[in-house]
């Protein structure tokens, strides 16, 4: 099962937070729509060692998805985007390969690693492109429609800077209008000047939980991301949400 990571804007830190969750919980990663190449998937996979599933739509230009698709002479059909299928393990090929504490191999091809991982752990972090109202098609289909199509709960990544309150409350309203479940907010400290009142205002006026405040990192590396502890309450929430989701299938 899966959770969806969206943000209040582009470059708000969705990939960093996705990487953080994958590192601490050992979940796989899936970015169904990518613009600007496969840099996000490559970063998460190389940083965490978990499988990064191939994007369904990937475009070379780092611009809005519907524009990138048009420039590439194609279009985005969200009905073609499904949660990755679970395949059989190739455990006979990896028994002698070093593993991490999550049972994931450190040195293994992406295909083989993904198949092994799926047997042990089928939980996935899905990362969106841009914010929830970014257009995907010229017919008006937006990222929020993809989230609704996948039927997965959402975590919103917000900035800690000026303007975050408005952007976050607008994002919440867009999701709530579609009756999409929001697990909570992660505040990403994108600079050293952290505005503490943002968190309080978002929690109060958005009637939602601040799951975590991610600190400003001067260097973004595996070690620096892993050094940011994930609270037990957030871990428990994510695990219980997916267990509950599984029980309904």
Curated annotation (Swiss-Prot):
The gene designation is bioD
- UniProt protein name: ATP-dependent dethiobiotin synthetase BioD
Identify the EC number(s): 6.3.3.3
Q: Which GO terms describe its biological process?
A: biotin biosynthetic process
User: What InterPro entries is this protein classified in?
Assistant: DTB_synth_BioD, P-loop_NTPase
Instruction: Quote the function comment for this protein.
Output: Catalyzes a mechanistically unusual reaction, the ATP-dependent insertion of CO2 between the N7 and N8 nitrogen atoms of 7,8-diaminopelargonic acid (DAPA, also called 7,8-diammoniononanoate) to form a ureido ring.
Catalytic function, reaction form: (7R,8S)-7,8-diammoniononanoate + CO2 + ATP = (4R,5S)-dethiobiotin + ADP + phosphate + 3 H(+)
**Keywords for this entry?**
ATP-binding, Biotin biosynthesis, Cytoplasm, Ligase, Magnesium, Metal-binding, Nucleotide-binding
């Amino acid at each position: 099962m899966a959770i969806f990571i969206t943000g209040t804007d582009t470059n708000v830190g969705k990939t960093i937070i996705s990487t953080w969750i994958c590192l601490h919980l050992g979940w796989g990663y899936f970015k169904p729509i990518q613009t600007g190449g496969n840099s996000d998937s490559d970063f998460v996979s190389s940083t965490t060692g978990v499988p990064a599933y191939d994007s369904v739509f990937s475009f070379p230009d780092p611009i809005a998805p519907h524009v990138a698709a048009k420039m590439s002479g194609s279009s985005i059909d969200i009905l073609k985007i499904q949660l990755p299928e679970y395949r059989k393990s190739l455990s006979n090929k990896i028994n002698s390969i070093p593993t991490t504490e999550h049972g994931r191999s450190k040195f293994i091809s992406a295909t083989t690693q993904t198949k092994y991982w799926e047997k042990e752990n089928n939980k996935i972090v899905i990362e969106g492109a841009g914010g929830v109202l970014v257009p995907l098609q010229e017919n008006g289909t937006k990222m929020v429609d993809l989230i609704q199509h996948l039927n997965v709960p959402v975590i919103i990544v917000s900035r800690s800077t000026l303007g975050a309150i408005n952007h976050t409350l607008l994002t919440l309203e867009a999701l709530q209008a579609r009756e999409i479940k929001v697990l909570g907010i992660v505040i990403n400290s994108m600079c050293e000047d952290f505005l503490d009142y943002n968190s309080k205002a978002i929690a109060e006026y958005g009637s939602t939980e601040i799951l975590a405040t991610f600190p400003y990192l001067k260097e973004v590396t595996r070690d620096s991301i892993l050094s940011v502890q994930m609270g037990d309450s957030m871990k428990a929430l994510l695990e219980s949400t997916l267990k509950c989701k599984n029980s309904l299938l």
